[in-house]
Structures are given as structure tokens and as C-alpha cells.
């Protein structure tokens, strides 16, 4: 792998920091805003860093940035906490009931917010691909029962958990996919059981 320029190191360090803080990468626009450059300039930096073997990008996805190698400025070991991977969420059972837990995975302590309960769900389907969430990813969830409009949440509808963008309307909840082939779900019976705070992906 080739050495990075100072600006490329700074861009890679910014991407690494954002992923550590919120679990998913910044958009090209966010990178441009951080460094005072155009989206085209940010894209050119990403492609140059990719050619040097530090990350991978995917076409037509604003957040599809996958780190392969850390920036030399970000080589400090990361402390981790184990959280449960929840299988099918059964109505009437606590989320952390033994019957629901498939396994445990480590997440960085920066993502684990003190004593706030956290869990993980395996993503199935392609309804959130436009925000870089793919089938097979493990969604890192902060357990909570309230949400703000525009947040990505886990909502329980009858006996099924779904990962969608939350909007509270006057007399119902609207849950939106981030894939145009899926229509919004409008319901009065959805229960919020968590908010997305990160993604765990195995390569």
C-alpha cells in the first residue's frame, strides 16, 4: 500500500472518526463540508485513497465507504464491549430474554453509551440500501421506546421487527424505507424498540 498525502491522511482520519462515533461513514457531501471542498473534490480524494488500498467505495451509494486499513493517525487499539445479537423479536417477551439471543458481538466503547442498554439485529432485505445498510449487516441498536422524526429505528409491528426511518404523524406512525421500490408503512400499532447507532459488517 502506498503512502498517503497529508490531506488524504486527514480525510481518512475523519472517516474513521465518524465511523467510530456513529457506526457508519460520512457522505461525500459531509466530507466536502468538513474540508471546505466540493463534492467532486471529496470524491477525488476518496478514489485516490481507495487506489492506495485504505478503503473501498461503491457506485451510487453516498455512504458506501468501507475501511480496509486504518489511517496511520488512527492506529490506537479500540476497547470493546459485548452486546447481544437478537434473533426474531417475539411480542410479549423482553428484548433481552434468553430465547431471543443468538450470540454476542463486540462494539467499540465509543459506541456503547455508558449504561444505556444496547443490542444488535441482523438486517434482512434491501429496504435501506440507499443509506448504506445492506442485507446481512448487523444493526447496532440503542434500546429506547421514543424517537424523533427522521431517525432510523427498530419498530415492532405485531410480531415482526423492522428497521425503517421514523415519522410521527397526527394520528399514525409512518415508517419509510430508503429504497424507492418499497412504499411507506403507515400504522397506529407500531412500537419503537430501539434507535440505530451503528453497523457491524463482517468481510
UniProtKB/Swiss-Prot annotation:
The GO biological-process annotations, alphabetized, read as: DNA repair; DNA replication; negative regulation of DNA-templated transcription; proteolysis; SOS response
Q: List the disulfide bonds.
A: none
Source domain of life is: Bacteria
One Pfam family of this chain: LexA_DNA_bind
EC number(s) on file: 3.4.21.88
Q: Provide the site residues for: Cleavage.
A: 91-92
The Gene Ontology terms for molecular function here are: DNA binding; serine-type endopeptidase activity
**DNA-binding region location:** 28-47
Q: Where is the active site?
A: 127, 164
- Keyword Repressor among UniProt keywords: yes
The protein's UniProt keywords, in alphabetical order, are:
Autocatalytic cleavage, DNA damage, DNA repair, DNA replication, DNA-binding, Hydrolase, Repressor, SOS response, Transcription, Transcription regulation
Q: What class of enzyme is it?
A: hydrolase
User: Reaction catalysed?
Assistant: Hydrolysis of Ala-|-Gly bond in repressor LexA
Instruction: Give the multimer and partner information.
Output: Homodimer.
Role summary: Represses a number of genes involved in the response to DNA damage (SOS response), including recA and lexA. In the presence of single-stranded DNA, RecA interacts with LexA causing an autocatalytic cleavage which disrupts the DNA-binding part of LexA, leading to derepression of the SOS regulon and eventually DNA repair.
Regarding protein family, the annotation reads: Belongs to the peptidase S24 family.
Descriptive protein name: LexA repressor
Please tell me the species this chain comes from: Leptospira borgpetersenii serovar Hardjo-bovis (strain JB197)
The organism that produces this protein has a lineage beginning with: Bacteria, Pseudomonadati, Spirochaetota, Spirochaetia, Leptospirales
Which gene is the coding source of this polypeptide chain?
A: lexA
Amino acid at each position: 500500500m502506498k503512502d498517503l498525502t497529508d490531506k488524504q491522511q486527514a480525510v481518512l482520519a475523519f472517516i474513521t472518526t465518524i465511523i467510530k462515533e456513529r457506526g457508519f461513514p460520512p457522505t461525500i457531501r459531509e466530507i466536502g463540508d468538513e474540508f471546505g471542498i466540493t463534492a467532486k473534490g471529496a470524491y477525488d480524494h476518496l478514489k485516490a485513497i481507495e487506489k492506495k488500498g485504505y478503503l473501498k467505495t461503491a457506485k451510487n451509494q453516498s455512504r458506501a465507504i468501507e475501511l480496509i486499513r486504518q489511517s496511520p493517525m488512527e492506529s490506537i487499539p479500540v476497547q470493546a464491549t459485548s452486546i447481544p445479537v437478537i434473533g426474531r423479536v417475539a411480542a410479549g417477551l423482553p428484548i433481552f430474554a434468553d430465547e431471543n439471543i443468538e450470540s454476542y458481538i463486540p462494539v467499540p466503547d465509543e459506541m456503547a453509551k455508558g449504561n444505556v442498554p444496547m443490542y444488535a439485529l441482523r438486517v434482512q432485505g434491501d429496504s435501506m440500501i440507499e443509506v448504506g445498510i445492506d442485507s446481512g449487516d448487523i444493526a447496532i441498536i440503542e434500546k429506547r421506546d421514543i424517537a424523533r422524526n427522521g431517525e432510523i429505528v427498530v419498530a415492532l409491528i405485531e410480531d415482526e421487527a423492522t428497521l425503517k426511518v421514523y415519522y410521527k404523524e397526527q394520528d399514525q406512525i409512518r415508517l419509510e424505507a430508503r429504497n424507492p421500490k418499497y412504499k411507506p408503512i403507515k400504522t397506529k400499532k407500531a412500537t419503537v424498540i430501539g434507535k440505530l447507532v451503528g453497523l457491524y459488517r463482517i468481510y
